[in-house]
Amino acid sequence: MAKTSMIVKQKREQKFKVREYTRCERCGRPHSVIRKFKLCRICFRELAYKGHIPGVKKASW
C-alpha cells in the first residue's frame, strides 16, 4: 500500500506536465499501471480472475 502523502501529492496539479504519472486507483502503486483500467498489474489480475472487470477473461489457445 502506498503512503497516503504520496497519493495526495500525485493528485495535485503539477507545475510541469512531465512530472505527472499514473498510480493504481485501488492500491496506489506507481509502477506497471494499465492506463485503460487505472489499475496496477497485480490488482488487474486479481479482479480479472474474480470476474469483476467486464469483458476480461483469461486467454487460452
Curated annotation (Swiss-Prot):
NCBIfam families: PRK08061.1 (NF005974)
Cofactor (UniProt): Zn(2+)
UniProt: Zn(2+) binding residues: 24, 27, 40, 43
Function: Binds 16S rRNA, required for the assembly of 30S particles and may also be responsible for determining the conformation of the 16S rRNA at the A site.
Pfam families reported in the protein's UniProt record: Ribosomal_S14
Name of the protein this chain belongs to: Small ribosomal subunit protein uS14C
GO molecular function: rRNA binding; structural constituent of ribosome; zinc ion binding
Ribonucleoprotein is among the record's keywords: yes
Cofactor: record remark: Binds 1 zinc ion per subunit.
Disulfide bond sites: none
Positions of transmembrane segments: none
BP GO terms, sorted: translation
Quaternary assembly: Part of the 30S ribosomal subunit. Contacts proteins S3 and S10.
A GO CC term attached to the entry: small ribosomal subunit
Primary gene name: rpsZ2
UniProt keyword terms in alphabetical order: Metal-binding, Ribonucleoprotein, Ribosomal protein, RNA-binding, rRNA-binding, Zinc
Family: Belongs to the universal ribosomal protein uS14 family. Zinc-binding uS14 subfamily.
Annotated InterPro entries: Ribosomal_uS14, Ribosomal_uS14_bact, Ribosomal_uS14_CS, Ribosomal_uS14_sf
